Amino acid sequence: MIIKNAKVFTEDGSFMQGDVVVKDGRFDSVLERTADTDAAADSTQQEIIDASGLIMIPGLVDIHFHGCKGADMCDGTAEALDVITAYEASVGVTSVCPATMTIQRDELLSVMKNAGDYNYHGGAHLVGINMEGPFISPSKKGAQAAENIMQCDYDYFCELQDAAHGLIKLVDIAPEEPGAIEFIDKVRGSVVVSIAHTAADYDTAVEAIEHGASHATHLYNAMPPLHHRNPGVIGAVRDSEKCHAELICDGVHIHPSVIRATFAMFGAKRMILISDSMRATGLEDGEYTLGGQAVTVRGPLATLHDGTIAGSATNLMDCMRFTVRQAGIPLEEAIMCATANPAKEIGIYDEAGSISAGKRADFVLLNDDLDIVSVYIDGKEISC
């Protein structure tokens, strides 16, 4: 298959008018548009996709979301994962690393086993698990269930990782809690350690980073705000070039001005767009659940009964659009933050995150308004 005359988002983070050849479900070559490529395409018997006037981007990679279309990662069933992977694919998210919640020990073990045993049926590729809780701070629990929060337990984590067949890619830690630094020492190098749901001050966050933490979960949310005398986690993460930070750009969690300021402070290469979506995403307003707690959804806003924000009701493609349209971030940077950056962060960049020879042919064709025209996974068009 040849995708002809597309505005291709290339691995170097720029656009090129070109043709992309797909063979056996993988990108074979990316060619700048010339008369020679026209002749080569015309001489083959391959399927030709005319992408004139369209933008071709890699399939998006969401490394932090909980569910969609009525299903949640913590439902712990293959059917829920089928719903999640199908919906995410339909909105251009072709690789997913869904997040768990702070649920009961045995229940979390069952959720991990379900994901580890999951058989792919098409749709978005399940490429990892984001373990959001239970090793967090009760004072910054957000929408997590307080009764299930616990101190870091390395043996329990190993049990969960074994059940998931090594699929846990990120683990969230509140570094000020007892045993957290020792836990980081034990797991660093085998999983991405993310500072999350934390009341840590600057020095404690710096210590965690020095011991191996390299990621910040939904920056600004469930952590102390940036203060000019107490920079906290945000300041510590900003000061470490090895750290990457998630942003929920759904129009609820972070003001567009702060999105712009964060990109200016960190640089686009350190930003990762996430959706943090919950099961109401893709459905009507109403009453739902997240981590066993009741959630009310009205438009893009999802809240617990006390008003606490409880994830989002927005998919990653819409978050990327918001980043461009409302926050004014260049399209090239927004795409990178929703594709290459998250893929690199969880170690799947050899398979996903860019349109490059040898990688899975997961891509999205968009029009100039950033509306989805078509989605391809493993070189095959899927129903949107």
Question: What does each model-identified segment do?
Answer:
Residues 236-245, 263-275, 280-366:
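His/Asp/Glu-enriched, well-ordered alpha-helical/loop segment
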Residues 86-97, 137-165, 207-219, 230-244, ...:
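Active-site gating loops and adjacent loop-to-helix segments of metal-dependent hydrolytic enzymes
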Residues 162-283:
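Active-site core of metal-dependent hydrolases
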Residues 66, 82-111, 124-137, 164-176, ...:
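Divalent metal-dependent hydrolysis catalytic cores, especially in the metallo-beta-lactamase
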Residues 6, 344, 354-384:
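C-terminal cap of metal-dependent C-N hydrolases
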Residues 53, 131, 187, 216, ...:
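Conserved, mostly hydrophobic/aromatic
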Residues 1-2, 8-57:
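Histidine-rich, glycine-flanked metal-binding segment
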